[in-house]
């Protein structure tokens, strides 16, 4: 029997604050989390985070390099906190990544395999960032994948649409939160 984990990726205060065009997003994501908790689905969180001074970041990295010299996504940054509307429950695993994909710089794969998890349900911000990268990484690691299309957000609605309708279906089942929670 397959064991499943719902991954909530990069739903951190600073990131959520940039995506306020869909006020129902967090409540929809909360419904997915509640559905997982009510079933036999592990809920895991992935968050971007660095040590003070960002020693893990190369100045050549166009995404993370500009953070060097700031407190961005360190323990001193309140914006690095997972949004309280969808915060982890006691015992939920939280994986801190150092790059875009959920597997980069984490022990996520080891933890999933050690728990016998074979199926992943992916949510998060952004569709063209952590979700896309994690779909590719997880597919290459032979996980069975589901992406909750409205459990993901992107700054570009057209990019989100193309990814969830034309790209992800090649490697994952794509469902809405309502479809997943009613299955």
Provide a role label for each language-model segment:
Residues 11, 48-50, 150:
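Active-site loop/turn elements of alpha/beta-hydrolase fold enzymes
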Residues 19-36:
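…and closely analogous acidic/polar surface helices at protein-protein or active-site interfaces
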Residues 1-5, 31-39, 64-183:
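Active-site-adjacent betaalpha module
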Residues 56-63:
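Short, flexible, mixed-charge acidic loops at enzyme active sites
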């Amino acid at each position: 029997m397959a064991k499943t984990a719902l991954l909530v990726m990069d739903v951190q205060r600073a990131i959520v604050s940039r995506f306020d065009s869909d006020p129902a997003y967090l409540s929809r994501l909360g419904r997915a989390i509640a559905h997982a908790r009510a079933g036999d689905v592990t809920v895991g969180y992935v968050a971007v985070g660095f040590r003070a001074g960002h020693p893990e970041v190369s100045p050549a990295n166009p995404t993370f390099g500009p953070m060097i010299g700031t407190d961005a996504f360190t323990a001193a940054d309140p914006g690095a906190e997972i949004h309280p509307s969808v915060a982890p429950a006691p015992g939920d695993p939280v994986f801190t990544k150092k790059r875009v994909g959920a597997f980069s710089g984490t022990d996520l794969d080891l933890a999933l395999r050690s728990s016998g998890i074979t199926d992943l349900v992916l949510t998060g911000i952004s569709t063209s960032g952590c979700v896309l990268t994690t779909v590719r990484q997880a597919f290459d690691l032979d996980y069975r994948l589901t992406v909750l299309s409205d459990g993901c957000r992107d700054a570009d609605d057209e990019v989100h649409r193309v990814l969830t309708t034309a790209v992800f279906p090649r490697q994952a089942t794509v469902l809405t939160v309502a479809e997943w929670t009613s299955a």
